[in-house]
Every structure is written in C-alpha cells, then in structure tokens.
Amino acid sequence: MILAYIQTSIMSRRCMGEEVLLVENIQIDDTSPPGGLVSIWTLNRPNKLNSLNSESHKALKEACEMAESNDLIRVIVIRGASPIPPLEGKRAKPASFAAGADISEFLGKNSDDVRDFFEDNAWERVWKLS
C-alpha cells in the first residue's frame, strides 16, 4: 500500500484569526479494494497546548459530519499541532496532543453555560463515527 498526497482542506472554523482544526485527506493508492482516504485532523491551537474551546468543539463536530458523508474515508487520525518555537529568552512550551478544555473561556459564565458546553460533547460524536 502506498499513501499519496491528494488534497488538503482546512476547516473554516476560526478562533481569533487562527484555524482551530486542520483537515488533510490523503489518498490510499492501493490496487486492491477498497482504496479510499486517510483523514488527518490536527488540533491547531499550539499556543494554548491545543486545548479545546467552543470553536474547536464546533470544528470537530463539522469534521465528523464531513467524515460521515464521505464514504471514501477509511481512517481518521487525530493529532495535536507541534508547539510554536519560543521567543528568544523564553521557555519552550511542551508538546501536547490536547491539554483538555480551555477553561479561560468559562470566565464570567454561569454554571449552566459551562454544563451545556460539556454536555454537547464533540468527542462523543468522534467516538460514534462509523
């Protein structure tokens, strides 16, 4: 089996000018059936250790919908973006898949809003992909 690069598509979900989830689809160049695509999803908030905010959750849900509607996708790999190199004299941030929830987003919100955020779980949709 040979993997051949065919396309890169970036989810349109942005947070403060950055794409929070990058989606890359790679063609499986295989002469035997079924062929198809490997979809690589990169959590792209390295300055926040790829922590998940509401925009990340929305992007993951959109990516799940895209994957469910594309019968060519055979495998999904989810990874975290590499850390940004530190400024001179600053300590480097550690590499991470995802640091968890970005709790800074909950400042000033009431407990009902926070509970709603966690009840509408994007990871549950990821686990249910078929």
Specify the residue positions occupied by each region the protein language model found.
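Glycine- (often His-adjacent) and acidic-residue-rich active-site loop
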Residues: G80-W127
